[in-house]
Amino acid sequence: MSVRALARVNIAAIERNVRRLRRELASSVALCAVVKADGYGHGALPAARAALAGGARWLAVVAATEAATLRTGGIDAPILVMGALSPGELDVALAARADVVGWDESFVDAVAARGGGAIHVKLDTGMGRLGTRDPAVATRVAEAAAIADGVRLAGAMTHFATADDRDDPFLHEQLARFVAWLGPLRDTHPQIVAHAANSAATLRDPATHFDLVRTGVAIYGLDPFGEDPLARELEPALELRSYVGAVKAVAPGESVGYGRSFVARRPTYVATLPIGYGDGVRRALTNNADVLVRGVRRPLVGTVSMDNVTLDVGAPPQAAVGDGAILIGEQGDERITAEELALRLDTINYEITCGLLPRVPRAYHRDGEDLS
């Protein structure tokens, strides 16, 4: 390897994941690929292009600057900016020809004052973050958008809080609130695009699909329920790799790493990889993860430091300097997923890939064929 660590992203996998998700949808339902947070750590522009090639019709982000990046990169598809926007951010979003999300009449006025734009009105049905909880207020905002100069009432939306918990009935409570508000609104404004479903809801209940689904995590081959992606025919697109930089003998009683969190009980060898929490490998994985070397799981031992992790590779050593190491991905018959790491860290798979830091370059390929 010419770099310490590398995240390899299979563009073809993203395309196939989008096609797989489209199989869940009626032909009249559009798929919006969510590429916020630099495409969940995969790279926003390559992910956006792959998603569109796979059949997505829309893209969604949270920040206005993310929309501007997509436009600068040559993306011409409809873009929805889902986050709250300051006056300056609203300028950027509208300049990028992005649709924006609003929930009070002053926002409609702000869009109109800037020459207009397309607004999606958000009803908070239970997420408790953005949007108005009051359906009457949401309707007034929609009516204001429909008549304001230069403004187009483009959509009506909500967001589910517990779609990824299949045993939690709150999804259907939220759905009922959204439907009760949406029905009368559509009687007056039949052209609006209604949308509510994230990846989990898309896979869980077709009643949530409406006109458009906003799929994020699943297009990257990450399972929205935190389970094995392959069981849902999702294909993880990202592989995180490093290499063995050093191998040394460790005698019984000798320690490895800060704080002596690993003390050898038997003669062994430790391999050091030049990747650490400065690259996005969480320190909480100390003595709590495996890495693939020569197709075999090797336990991570010792404290994860900023620039290195260390593995017990046995005696005699089953690793040599230069061997490839896989932290996320496949090698031989073994596989380590973002879901596995998330389980070890008591978090979600999104955080694993979003947490890869800028020191890790991204490289793109199509089923093994490198892309320039």
Model segments located where?
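Solvent-exposed alpha-helices and their adjacent loops that cap or buttress functional pockets
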Residues: 25, 72, 92-93, 114, ...
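A structural signal for short, hydrophobic beta-strand segments that form beta-sheets
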Residues: 81, 153, 244, 300-301
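Conserved beta-strand segments that form the floor/walls of ligand-binding pockets within enzyme
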Residues: 34, 120-122, 155, 214, ...
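Catalytic metal-binding/acid-base residues of hydrolase active sites
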Residues: 126, 161, 200, 218, ...
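Gly-rich Lys/Arg/Thr-decorated short loops/hinges at beta-loop-alpha junctions or inter-strand turns
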Residues: 1-3
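Anionic-ligand-binding alpha/beta catalytic cores of soluble enzymes and soluble regulatory domains
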Residues: 167-269
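C-terminal accessory subdomain/extension
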Residues: 249-372
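Active-site-proximal beta-alpha core segment in soluble small-molecule metabolic enzymes
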Residues: 5-8, 13-16, 27-196, 209
